[in-house]
Amino acid sequence: MLRWITAGESHGRALVAVVEGMVAGVHVTSADIADQLARRRLGYGRGARMTFERDAVTVLSGIRHGSTLGGPIAIEIGNTEWPKWETVMAADPVDPAELADVARNAPLTRPRPGHADYAGMLKYGFDDARPVLERASARETAARVAAGTVARAFLRQALGVEVLSHVISIGASAPYEGPPPRAEDLPAIDASPVRAYDKAAEADMIAQIEAAKKDGDTLGGVVEAVALGLPVGLGSFTSGDHRLDSQLAAAVMGIQAIKGVEIGDGFQTARRRGSRAHDEMYPGPDGVVRSTNRAGGLEGGMTNGQPLRVRAAMKPISTVPRALATVDLATGDEAVAIHQRSDVCAVPAAGVVVETMVALVLARAALEKFGGDSLAETQRNIAAYQRSVADREAPAARVSG
């Protein structure tokens, strides 16, 4: 089974991603990973740290000459600011006298509302929020994006599947409700300052960010990930944890600052009558076709051959420049929350991270369905399955013809 895990702190020496269970023979390079990490840095409203926190990628294991080996893949993303933090974030004990005059080591005792600071300090017995915020930081998503690059490569090479995303809305901007983008639209989306597919909405999104920045505030928004080219039958109806929608929702909700997930038309479907909530089927030249995709490519926990659509709602960033009211846990007094440098809006970047988690879940589902130790073996298994599906859909194709 495909598994992944990340390690590292925001200001630590490095982040590390480990991917286990990937078949041999998938072509992926450190340049591919760096390209995806660069996409994660995109977006109007990002903070100054995006200009100096470079992502230095080193593949430690599992890939040789640009091809996966079948063993665990370890990827390191170095922190170019490490020399500034080496004493504060050292793994081994440091002489207190050496730390006494280091401003970066000052205890952070005023938790930020909306962040992991408060609950993390109480749960783990910390007198300082530093150990919490270092791991809870969205900087960790860089390691996920690195892992997801391997999953993307597998999906593309094994199944011809492409995963992309775009921003639906930022703040109070009008949400985009048109058709989802296609694979060829991704370069234009990434070229947009807010990663918007709808150019008409771009100016409104930018204006929302500018207004929030002027007011010393932050903004959230909604992104949509789309997976194109999926076969019928990934996932299962047999048990709740085997349903692909439950796996996707869990993976996307696990991203920092994501507060809601919907598949397809999601909550809109709940307001419709059944006759207008589902996707009717008709005979087509290659089998069954549909005129709508309200289900977002999933029915009964399984892919149905339609484009997969997953939307995620991101809350405004918890580190608010004008600072929110809190309690100093060292004294019990009223206080204003600590302020770390941060973004005004990270919604465009969140779309890339949502893509990543969708790709990882889909790659796992595909490997569970088709198996194999090498890409070539998996491709043979996929081809046999697709022939079987085509045979079962042949009656509909004959009727259409």
UniProtKB/Swiss-Prot annotation:
Binding site for NADP(+): 40, 46
Pathway where this protein functions: Metabolic intermediate biosynthesis; chorismate biosynthesis; chorismate from D-erythrose 4-phosphate and phosphoenolpyruvate: step 7/7
EC identifiers of the protein: 4.2.3.5
Keywords: Amino-acid biosynthesis, Aromatic amino acid biosynthesis, FAD, Flavoprotein, FMN, Lyase, NADP
The protein's required cofactors: FMNH2
Cofactor binding note from Swiss-Prot or TrEMBL: Reduced FMN (FMNH(2)).
UniProt keyword Transferase present: no
A single Gene Ontology CC term: cytosol
InterPro entries: Chorismate_synth, Chorismate_synth_AroC_sf, Chorismate_synthase_CS
Catalysed conversion reaction: 5-O-(1-carboxyvinyl)-3-phosphoshikimate = chorismate + phosphate
Subunit structure: Homotetramer: dimer of dimers.
HAMAP family: Chorismate_synth
Known role: This reaction introduces a second double bond into the aromatic ring system.
Assigned protein family: Belongs to the chorismate synthase family.
Protein name listed in UniProt: Chorismate synthase
Organism: Mycobacterium tuberculosis (strain ATCC 25618 / H37Rv)
Lineage: Bacteria, Bacillati, Actinomycetota, Actinomycetes, Mycobacteriales
Gene expressing this chain: aroC
